[in-house]
Amino acid sequence: MKNIIRLAIAYIRYYKKQAAALLMGVVLSAALFTGIGSLFQSGRMAALENARLEYGDWHYNTRGDFSSEEEFIKKLQGKGYEVEKYGLETVRKAIEEPYNIQFVYADKGYLDMMGRKLKKGKYPEKENEIAMDSYTLKNLGVEEKTGEQVALDGEIFTLSGILTEMPEKLPKQQGDFMQVFVNSTLDYGKNGTFLYLKFAEDGNVYKQVTAFANNFGIKVRNFTRNNGLSSYVGAEAPADILETIKTGLKYKEAGFPYIWEQLNGNGTLTDKVILAALALFSAFVIYSLFQISVSKRMSQYSVMPVSYTHLRAHETG
């Protein structure tokens, strides 16, 4: 082993230019691959953070039909999953006039996930108090000022607070509606509670929601995923990918463009293809440099027997 190492060092010293060229090719290829990979990773993280703002910082939601919130909190971390953040939204009532509006009570976790922060005033503390964002106030023709009276569905509420807008693209997933926030004690007997979950993103999110569902005896199909974030955090079911490919191959009018569009969520597949192409290119460059070096050595070695023959002939002549 030592002899091999010595031979390699001697070779590098003797053929400095070729060794330097090969080393430079390896370094430049590695630098190119690493640089592009880092660039893609930075872009991906920036896109993920932007998606959190546009869709909300959650992975799945489901009906929050738990016996008690205290019991649920005890199981935030279990075998195969870790709930990093959760929020509860209770829809007290929904009306269609003058607009599609939901009367909602939400806990701090939900408000945080949706980026709902108080700009003015306070969250409703009484049954006749209400809070909403500037967009909803504008549509209802109410002045953006706490203490204003708001008439909705035959009731009069006092505007206690003004919040920031809901995530811009949330209605694309849940329907076109506006929210007004009410006190926890206001009850119309039509409550629907929804649990929003964000799992630890250092692990596969789909596997975590599966483990979570099994732990609480909930069917995975009863969970609705946040499509805006799913491709970034691994929240898509493997069956979805296979089904997409089958559909694309089954229907000629769909074909490869359909498969690519469905699987290339947020451009992640494009990034992987480009990185794979760069890896192949880097390997080709290194291989080419190595082949050139080997070819030169082979040509030199082939001259040696001829030179030796001429030398012997000269000596005997």
Regions found by a protein language model. Name each.
Residues G43, L289-V303, S307:
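Transmembrane helix boundary and interhelical loop/hinge segments in multi-pass membrane proteins
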